[in-house]
């Protein structure tokens, strides 16, 4: 049975929105070129954006909100934090029930002024009377902080953006920034996995908006889907192309490239096995020429494509062997380990390495709990690999990988959640010296509780500017007092020895200066900033 992140509260059905990942302090080649670490005020400290996509605005259930917390020498602080909602503080649009503002997040310097900007998915946005069509808000950085002044709202069929808004397209479900044409302005890829294409229901698609001195523009924007414009794969119903996006320079040619998750792609007769399309950048932007189609039955890729694996459900790019080519980690949260059902949905992560010709299956890896030094035991419904983030947590110049395991059972607490951390080296990622974190022990802030979903989202950034990436962990079902699923975020700090729970922090709305009020089912921490994967 396929595992869906669905919760029922007060008659509402809400999905745990897509996770976002970020790389911090990893070196330019590992980053999505042009994406710029999420430093909205350009003070040298990475900042943290946190989505609460089911936040109620007044009586508008699920309108959504985004908190922004700023970095400092002491790390992330709630002091001076901001709360953005549509139609307030200059942010474009109008808050409406079910908009899901904050469903996804991505950061890049879209106008190349030295300040990181923030793209916010509102995938449930109604366009006119078209419910769930989806939209993307863009907020711009400044010397003071992020501002709604000059903000933009993009959706299909307006301002040059190709396509037409249709019910439940979920435009903005996934976002990723990179400079795909290498003109110095970050561009934005937008996934909408429920797009119907040529009669193929929920085939999925992705738009690309290009940056300019005036910021993002729909002029020259592109529309990609499988089976057209050179994109590999057949156009099929229910593939969900565009469910996840990640940018990196996989062939190190100076142009950002884009990986697109297709987690419900059928491989042979195995439905929902999953795949990843990779599109390469050029002076003219992204194009299908030389694009690739990856899955577990592809040449060199470790593993076997099986029904309901969900290969491509999460993605993160980083230079895990420090050879100058970005590599790609691919979450396979439905992977079965051992005999079913005990190992069903235990989860795994594939890693493909970059080269002068792009990503290659040669030397690929498959990681799972309990093998090769990776901590933990593969168990039913753990979903190891549901979320991914790359960053140099030990400041040795090589990207490392954080892996969310949000449904991990810890000490009898069902679905408490955990995060595994794998470290990079000249030979690539390794389970040697890997770590496992969860709330409570080892100094990690918070209390170990059932159904918290620690690790549902992960994101890296150098919040204290010490040269090592730090890790933000979303805990969207954390109860704040009696308020179930109000949500929280933990921050763990990096250093020469890697990540540590010592000095870690816990943040939630209404405490420690964080703007807003913790309320039942806000799901603060469902999404985290996705700056450069």
Model-assigned labels for residue ranges:
Residues 14-20:
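Hydrophobic membrane-targeting signal helices
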């Amino acid at each position: 049975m396929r595992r869906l992140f669905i919760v029922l509260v007060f008659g509402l059905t809400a999905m745990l929105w897509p996770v976002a990942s970020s790389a911090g302090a990893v070196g330019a080649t590992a980053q999505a070129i042009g994406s710029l670490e999420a430093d909205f005020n350009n003070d040298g400290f990475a900042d943290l954006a946190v989505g609460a996509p089911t936040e109620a605005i007044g009586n508008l259930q699920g309108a959504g909100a985004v908190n922004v917390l700023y970095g400092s020498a002491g790390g992330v602080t709630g002091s001076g934090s901001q709360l953005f909602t549509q139609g307030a503080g200059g942010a474009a649009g109008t808050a409406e029930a079910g908009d899901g503002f904050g469903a996804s997040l991505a950061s890049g310097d879209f106008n190349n002024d030295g300040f990181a900007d923030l793209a916010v998915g509102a995938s449930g946005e109604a366009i006119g009377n078209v419910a769930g069509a989806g939209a993307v808000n863009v907020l711009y950085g400044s010397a003071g902080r992020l501002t709604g002044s000059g903000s933009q709202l993009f959706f299909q069929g307006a301002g040059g953006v190709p396509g037409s808004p249709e019910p439940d397209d979920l435009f903005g479900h996934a976002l990723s920034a990179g400079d795909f044409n290498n003109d110095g302005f970050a561009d934005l890829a937008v996934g909408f996995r429920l797009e119907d294409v040529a009669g193929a229901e929920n085939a999925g698609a992705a738009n690309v908006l290009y940056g300019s001195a005036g910021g993002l523009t729909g002029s020259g924007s592109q529309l990609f889907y499988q089976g057209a414009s050179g994109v590999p794969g057949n156009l099929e119903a229910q593939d969900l192309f565009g469910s996840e996006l990640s940018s990196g320079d996989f062939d190190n040619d100076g142009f950002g490239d884009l990986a697109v998750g297709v987690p419900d792609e059928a491989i042979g007769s195995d439905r929902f096995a999953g795949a990843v399309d990779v599109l390469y950048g050029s002076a003219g932007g992204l194009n299908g020429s030389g694009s690739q189609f990856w899955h577990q039955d592809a040449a060199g890729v470790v593993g076997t494509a099986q029904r309901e694996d969900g290969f491509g459900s999460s993605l993160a790019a980083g230079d895990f062997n420090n050879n100058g080519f970005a590599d790609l980690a691919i979450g396979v949260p439905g992977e079965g380990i051992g005999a079913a059902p005990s190992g069903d949905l235990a989860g795994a992560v594939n890693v493909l390495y970059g080269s002068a010709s792009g990503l290659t299956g040669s030397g690929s890896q498959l990681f799972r709990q309990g093998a090769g030094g990776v901590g933990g035991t593969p168990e039913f419904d753990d979903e190891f690999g549901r979320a991914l983030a790359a960053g140099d947590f030990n400041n040795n110049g090589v990207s490392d990988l954080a892996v969310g395991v949000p449904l991990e059972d810890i000490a009898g607490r069902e679905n408490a959640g955990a995060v595994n951390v794998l470290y990079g080296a000249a030979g690539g990622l390794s389970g040697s010296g890997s770590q496992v974190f969860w709330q409570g022990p080892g100094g990690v802030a918070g209390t170990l509780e059932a159904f918290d979903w620690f690790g549902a989202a992960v994101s890296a950034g150098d919040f204290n500017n010490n040269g090592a990436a730090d890790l933000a962990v979303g805990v969207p079902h954390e109860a704040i007092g009696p308020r179930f699923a109000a949500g929280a975020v933990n921050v763990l700090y990096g250093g020469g020895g890697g990540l540590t729970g010592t000095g870690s922090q816990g943040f939630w709305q209404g405490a420690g200066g964080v703007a807003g009020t913790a309320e039942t089912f806000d799901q603060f921490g469902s999404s985290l900033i996705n700056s450069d994967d």
